[in-house]
């Protein structure tokens, strides 16, 4: 399997490193406008190949991405401290207006995995600019937010996060929605697992999830390790046809009467991309929050200067 990463910044290289050490691809092409830095990153990465299962890695131009089973987009303007993901929109739209058509000239049938922020908007932009079927354009969405949510809850409950079912849906950003009504371990709802939990404490967990990126950016400038692992999980689900349920961002198809946007819902991910969406039953409050999240994204989409 061949994959390409567009953008060799901290996120792009974290994705590359994670995929290499997990033997995800046979061939990996990396592309960046800063050729000198790109070549240095590739040199550093290939020198570790003797320690893992081999992957063919090289720096390349967009033409070298031809034949990629998946192309991962991490390129774009960097989120500044205090800047929301949505503030990034127009700067990254301008970058993608040149990038996506050029990429499609070489990879007309690829799976496109968008990681650049604001990811839901950039997934929508990539879909419209690429002309690919909706299921083949996927955003990393709230995969990372869901992981953060599960980690914090599992720490409190003293279980492995992989044994806890919990989801963050909607925008990957300030309007994201915690689906508290579906949090469970082995089918047991959270209220039965820990009935003495203070609602304020639960609210604090969600605030930690929602503000995590801002806190990390304030301290170290960017998030990288966790999203690299999350992207690897998505790529493995795609290329290994795992039919794995992940909260990726994709075009809405009438679920919950939402407007046409890209946002995250639990979706079955396999070799064809997003294969179907699992429409969970939500409480009235969760539905309202999800609609609010979708409306915020729709307003941003409507403001884009194409």
From Swiss-Prot:
The active site is at 172 (proton acceptor). GO terms for cellular component: cytoplasm. Pathway: Fermentation; pyruvate fermentation to lactate; (S)-lactate from pyruvate: step 1/1. The keyword Cytoplasm applies. Allosterically activated by fructose 1,6-bisphosphate (FBP). The keyword Oxidoreductase applies. It is an enzyme of class 1 (oxidoreductase). GO terms for molecular function: L-lactate dehydrogenase activity. It is found in: Cytoplasm. One of its GO terms (biological process) is lactate metabolic process. SUPFAM superfamilies: LDH C-terminal domain-like, NAD(P)-binding Rossmann-fold domains. The modification Phosphotyrosine is found at residue 214. It catalyses: (S)-lactate + NAD(+) = pyruvate + NADH + H(+). Its main location: cytoplasm. Substrate binds at residues 79, 85, 117-120, 145-148, 223. NAD(+) binds at residues 11, 32, 37, 76-77, 115-117, 140. It comes from the Bacteria. Its EC number is 1.1.1.27. Beta-D-fructose 1,6-bisphosphate binds at residues 150, 165. Keywords: Allosteric enzyme, Cytoplasm, NAD, Oxidoreductase, Phosphoprotein. Belongs to the LDH/MDH superfamily. LDH family. Catalyzes the conversion of lactate to pyruvate. HAMAP family: Lactate_dehydrog. Homotetramer. This is L-lactate dehydrogenase. It comes from Synechococcus sp. (strain JA-2-3B'a(2-13)).
